[in-house]
Amino acid sequence: MKNTTILSAILLMTSIVFVSCQGSPAREEKLPIMSWYSIPAEDATLERYQELADCGFNINFSHLGSLEDLRTSLDLAQQVGVKVMATCRELETSPDSVVALVKDHPALYGYFLRDEPACPSFPYLAEWARKIEYADGGEHPLYLNLLPNFVDTAVLTCNYRESVRRFIAEVKLPMVSFDYYPVTFGGISSDNWYDNMQVIHDESEAAGLPFWAFALSTAHDPYPLPTMASLRLELYTALAYGAQGLQYFTYWNPGTEVWNFHEAPINQNKERSEAYYLVQQMNRELQARAFVFVGSKVVSISHVGKTIFRGCKAMEELPAHVVSLETGDDGAVVSLLEKDGWYYLVLVSRTLERPTDLKVAFDTRVHMIGPDGKAVRLPKGENALSIGEGDVAIFRYRK
């Protein structure tokens, strides 16, 4: 596999634009944002693909049945500036011939193998992956999505961390992805979710691989309708832990009645729902701040607050250049990122019930990165701030 080529493919969404603002980063970058369960073959029109692009997605992942459907998707996506995560029945039965037909298409992002596999399937997936890689010449990444950590070990056949480690070692894909939707009608499943995030961060970092994570955009049992607060909580937490790609489940409303799927961004009536506009707003905000996260390295990740959840690390020392940091009992995720000579202190709310009060002081000049990506200089001394429900505060300063 061409490792440098694959890495650039994973960050294919990145565009470099020089800016002239004093003290601003040297370039603006784009996060990969993928629509899971996207436009079906029977609704594949240029208008629908433009609608997807207008919502802020730059990778389309439709569950397509045939190679013909896939080629149609690629052609439409190209016209609206979107890439495609490729899947079809023939990719598994005849990988050589499928890859030969699509590998040079400008809209191809990568190839999808399987959703939520258990350990016994890893040898087969590895064999299949090598066939695709060989046919593709290592030009595009291969992708699958892992189970969350609350799945019974009888399904995984080993403990969760070991299953992630085995996936990385045995299947040998250039990225790690997992899904966990922490917001239910009963609240936030904080213990499991943060522990899951920590495991994925640890194992992907140890292997030198990027990881991708999810937000839930479609209500179904036992998950409520998304809100801006729930989307921010899920996505900014993932980015604070080092995620390099983001995904929404789902974009198009699934037809099955088993899980009571409803009010997807494109809902059961094939119309835009309120979720469409929430996701659109969220994606604009994410891309405005993408320069903070794309290619950043996690220096440290910890938690403050009355409760330190399972698998999380309590903050034992202040991040670099931070003189004091206080929150209320609700606490926050405390992540220090570094990139291009900058530190980014990322503080993410852990509650959807109320704003989080924050007091923070630094020993150096600091700017706060707003939702529009603009940097606003903080006054010297202690700053008393409020982080909205599920929201984030981002501080930038020189190393």
Question: What spans do the regions from the language model cover?
Answer:
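Bacterial N-terminal signal peptides that target proteins for export
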Residues: 1-9
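Core hydrophobic alpha-helical transmembrane segments of single-pass membrane proteins
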Residues: 11-13
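C-terminal motif of bacterial Sec signal peptides marking the signal peptidase cleavage site
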Residues: 19-20
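Glycan-processing catalytic domains of CAZymes
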Residues: 24-365, 371-399
